[in-house]
Amino acid sequence: MSLSVTRENFDEWMVPVYVPAPFIPVRGEGSRLWDQQGKEYIDFAGGIAVNALGHAHPALREALNEQANRFWHTGNGYTNEPALRLAKKLIDATFAERVFFCNSGAEANEAALKLARKYAHDRIGNHKSGIVAFKNAFHGRTLFTVSAGGQPSYSQDFAPLPPDIRHAAYNDLNSASALIDDNTCAVIVEPVQGEGGVIPATKAFLQGLRELCDRHQALLIFDEVQTGVGRTGELYAYMHYGVTPDILTTAKALGGGFPIGAMLTTQDYASVMTPGTHGTTYGGNPLATAVAGKVLDIINTPEMQNGVRQRHDAFIERLNTINVRFGMFSEIRGLGLLLGCVLQTEFAGKAKLIAQEAAKAGVMVLIAGGDVVRFAPALNVSDEEIATGLDRFALACERLQTGGAPCG
């Protein structure tokens, strides 16, 4: 008999690094979730841009079950068919010639930064170890990646931090140019800063970074953990910009909810990595790669990407209508189905309150700092779910603005 659990048990049993919502989801289908009490939610949070095809997609369940009935794991002393097939799909769909599989975005970024340093050390010299990243970025929670992320609140308690990492202002080419020099081995950047406020890079900024990296023999790393796998209306966001990185990291939506990450690069850069220089126990796990292969099959189609662009327009239109009514947002921005509503000054710091009211109204949204409400719904969310979810979001906005009784 299963143990009966409640939200209060989290506070009793779990390390307190999260503050989960007061409800516990127990079942999902498409873009809808139901909690222990049977209440329905429209899911515009998407597991933080993970559930690209919603919950319990039948094709993903089939791929997982089929592989689960074969075998689950062997470790990196052996390869497997699903991993090789997924690698080939990623290579065929991108600039990449080599793939490294891992379990998360943080691990993918850790691998990318290690590769960049090793390439510079082997090909140029040990002096070339500098990494340039950007303020308000987020690249993961390992000590290396949290140091590269330009948010001191995430790293300040863990000193001493890895050295030779400097941070420029995002979308400011002059700021980046002042830091990138011949001692720089890598520049790591998000095409859209997700945790930093859903801020898309300008084309001129990314093109300028590409030119600076070429000039100083530094590798350009695109962190596409949040923007990748169709989220922006292209398979990867770099395709919007006409700027090709040397290394790309991907995770989140790649597994559609099953943990997986990957680092993509070229044969030349990958060649400095030899057996033992890096590794992972679970990376390339056949369960994860079987599911991810099916995710790519579904998402990497013109129909899906056109659908993301159409759904983007539907969200923007309805969010603008909500804003005309309530005047709460100074800007609505983003690419594809990664969107952020920036709060007006009078509502500054209240993004979390809006998210809480939204949940009471029956819609799940995210935040990106205290001033931005973030949306990362499934890429196949229906028109009806968009309409219903944003009607519920409007109710939450009304409740917050008027100070009325809580929703629900």
UniProtKB/Swiss-Prot annotation:
What SUPFAM superfamilies does the record point to? PLP-dependent transferases (SSF53383)
The record's family statement is: Belongs to the class-III pyridoxal-phosphate-dependent aminotransferase family. AstC subfamily.
Biological process terms from the Gene Ontology for this record are: alpha-amino acid biosynthetic process; arginine catabolic process to glutamate; arginine catabolic process to succinate; ornithine catabolic process
Names of the cofactor(s)? pyridoxal 5'-phosphate
Superkingdom of source:
Bacteria
Q: Which NCBIfam families match?
A: arg_catab_astC, argD, PRK01278.1, PRK05093.1, PRK12381.1
Q: What does the function comment of this entry state?
A: Catalyzes the transamination of N(2)-succinylornithine and alpha-ketoglutarate into N(2)-succinylglutamate semialdehyde and glutamate. Can also act as an acetylornithine aminotransferase.
Q: Which CDD domains match?
A: OAT_like
Where would you find the membrane-spanning parts of this chain? none
The GO molecular function terms of this record are:
identical protein binding; pyridoxal phosphate binding; succinylornithine transaminase activity
Pathway(s) served: Amino-acid degradation; L-arginine degradation via AST pathway; L-glutamate and succinate from L-arginine: step 3/5
What EC number(s) has UniProt assigned to this enzyme? 2.6.1.81
Name this polypeptide is given? Succinylornithine transaminase
Species source reads Salmonella paratyphi B (strain ATCC BAA-1250 / SPB7)
Q: Which UniProt keywords apply?
A: Aminotransferase, Arginine metabolism, Pyridoxal phosphate, Transferase
The answer to keyword Transferase applying to this record is: yes
Q: Which residues carry this modification: N6-(pyridoxal phosphate)lysine?
A: 252
PROSITE patterns reported in the protein's UniProt record:
AA_TRANSFER_CLASS_3
Reactions catalysed, as given in the entry: N(2)-succinyl-L-ornithine + 2-oxoglutarate = N-succinyl-L-glutamate 5-semialdehyde + L-glutamate
